Amino acid sequence: MKHLALIGSTGSIGRQVLQVVRSIPDTFIIETLAAYGRNQEALISQIREFNPRVVAVREETTYKELRKLFPHIEILLGEEGLVSVATEPSVTMTIVASSGIDALPAVIAAIRQKKTIALANKESLVAAGELVTTLARENGVQILPIDSEHNALFQCLEGRDSSTIKKLLLTASGGPLRNKSKEELQKVSLQEVLRHPVWNMGPKITVDSSTLVNKGLEIIEAFWLFGLEAVEIEAVIHPQSLVHGMVEFCDGTILSVMNPPSMLFPIQHVLTFPERSPAIGPGFDFLSNRTLEFFPIDEDRFPSVHLAKRVLLEKGSMGCFFNGANEALVHRFLAGEISWHQIVPKLQALVDQHRVQSCLSLEEILSVDAEARARAQEC
């Protein structure tokens, strides 16, 4: 029996985590939940179904309402509540299904309490990869990736000699704008950006997918997650989104993980690891998926991946700054303050101006993040 903490329970990944939990009875217990969105009704339904020991929320109105409805459950508010959810003594696996850097203190606290980390929050590794992975090694904690690309790489790399690995390949659908010309990209609408051809995701990650910043973030995440200093990490466009990641070995062999474009597959793999359980949905059918296409990323139209590689080379505070500035720029786009085609040029200008510093502590990382967001609001 695995005892789970779930951060981000009402978001897209969180809801699918609970779908997997429902489908494999007598395997999991939901000990704690945290939901920092505004979907109060969904959270109430989850509490009634799973009866967690502890629940954490951000909104004070939600906090007060839950305390009235569930007097037998410990209801907590704010960042301290999030940390408590992640580190509850009965928990054996902390699932971080939320996006954004807000979950970072809880991730670090859970690692220090030696909880297995199931991670769908790429910002934790992009902004604080050195800190998070160092703490994980020191505490003997395993970080299991939920992101479909990193989960695919994890499965391909399991049990392999790192000296035999030549290249890691992440796949990208290309996002909702992949077929638009450079001229057309100058005038895309919010509706076009949010109309992803394959994945159903939240607005922030959908915008990141459209700029391919998401793939840049994933390259940085893969570097910290797998710790393969000398191994090349690349991304390729794969419109069908059936191959999620590939590992090329020194002898020319390539291993890949293939499944339909559903997050249920990597979520189930992580939750049941190191065991495997029957899939809760239909798997990959070669006869109905006979076309697999791969294309290089057009860096002229989508320069963000090249920018992310530069960020990775500089290390230090650069990843944190890159992540924070991008998130603020995306929110400005969603609010109608800037156009889509301004996001990456503004991000590149901010990165050019940032003076890299060492980021060893949580406090330093959060300070750089705040600086990045403030500067992105002003540019």
From Swiss-Prot:
Pathway: Isoprenoid biosynthesis; isopentenyl diphosphate biosynthesis via DXP pathway; isopentenyl diphosphate from 1-deoxy-D-xylulose 5-phosphate: step 1/6
Xref: NCBIfam families: Dxr (TIGR00243)
Classification via InterPro entries: DXP_reductoisomerase, DXP_reductoisomerase_C, DXP_reductoisomerase_N, DXPR_C, DXPR_C_sf, NAD(P)-bd_dom_sf
Enzyme class, UniProt record, top EC level: oxidoreductase
Record keywords, A-Z: Isoprene biosynthesis, Manganese, Metal-binding, NADP, Oxidoreductase
Function recorded in the entry: Catalyzes the NADPH-dependent rearrangement and reduction of 1-deoxy-D-xylulose-5-phosphate (DXP) to 2-C-methyl-D-erythritol 4-phosphate (MEP).
Identification of the protein by name: 1-deoxy-D-xylulose 5-phosphate reductoisomerase
Family classification: Belongs to the DXR family.
A molecular function (GO) term: 1-deoxy-D-xylulose-5-phosphate reductoisomerase activity
